[in-house]
């Protein structure tokens, strides 16, 4: 298959192919323009993969541009986080990072040009009055009483705005379009508002700041963007995008194209709702492993490759739809099944004593790091007469479907011996505290010599060599597929979204590094946590289970 055939295809790429074939463009130039007022989430990853992926596939350029026109909500912390997320996903922007604030002087000059042409005016209605005058979808708006000021008066008032002569909310600059337009976005939209706030890039140079719709199209044009890709909620805004560029003296007129945003089950994408989760401490921060933020997914153990694969699979369309969480989980599960080394950890431990094993002795058992990849090598794991097994791997009585350890029957310890359960000890409440077994010394990594069949295999950790670990079992943050539709989305938070266990792991995991994934055999995929791990305490996060347990629960 050729490189071109291997590329994903969608309506945007078809437009680009036509533009290149017709000679309309010879180089493709896209951009990713986040506002630095929060952390990026999986929905932004779709836009990142689309814009940077197109530039990559067509040997073009993609800018990273911060839409930093509201200093009240923005912070350099978010700028740094966004840059880190884009790079972590595996993409690189063209040249230096761009900022809309880089163009404040040009934007101001274009605003003056619109005033000079009689296409913009300074309005002194209050924000509430502007909303009232705007009308509704069924009713046209009303002209502001300040709409017909002369060009000279508007120029003087706009300069007064710029030099701090008005208080916040007392004046704004509006485009003069059509208050009866069927599209509310075209009813004399605000182009500039007053904000006495220090900007993280320009300091206190400005006290007037341009609105998104005015800034976005001009920034695209100044950067030579050929295809401006936005999500569907900006579809009506395209009319204003084109109006601004049609009415100023600028040589380049990019085109805006809209695609559906990413909606994902069992989570929320609204910045307001995500912020509420953080500020009300329902989660521990923006990088909480249950959050849909890129930093949260990264801390949970998701790989950049799995997120890119997910964005590739869901594709790009004009139709809004909701993607199953299982689709995202299958991407990371497939990635880690292929690439994660194996290790053993016992999450809910109970002691197993092998009574006929040489007392006080131990031995090393060789285990492959990956069952299907000999090139990943092997490791030596200590084995002894006292081990930890998972409590769920033993029953005093069980039916034939239970393939683990049962009283009076045998089971294989992974890559070690066959053991037989002989008796148990219990505490005062009747809980099993110790399982006593015997072992067949001739079954190290081989079948019993007499040909008897031992079907079950369980994992284990040598008690004398065990590494105490905290294991954080993360699950879906919400208990319903569409929490955003709930009357109170906080009421449907999954109470089991985080369960903390104290367990034991094989000693090789002492050398685990944050972010590196492992398959804990028979348990799932885990990675060392970057926040809570210390030299004395190893904390592992569950990235995803070995299979989709939610699908079974929903049947």
From Swiss-Prot:
A motif ('HIGH' region) lies at residues 34-44. It comes from Citrobacter koseri (strain ATCC BAA-895 / CDC 4225-83 / SGSC4696). Gene3D superfamilies: Glutamyl-trna Synthetase, Domain 2, Glutamyl-tRNA Synthetase, Domain 3, HUPs, Ribosomal Protein L25, Chain P. It is an enzyme of class 6 (ligase). Keywords: Aminoacyl-tRNA synthetase, ATP-binding, Cytoplasm, Ligase, Nucleotide-binding, Protein biosynthesis. GO terms for cellular component: cytosol. The keyword Protein biosynthesis applies. ATP binds at residues 35-37, 41-47, 231, 261-262, 269-271. Residues 317-324 are annotated as: Interaction with tRNA. This is Glutamine--tRNA ligase.
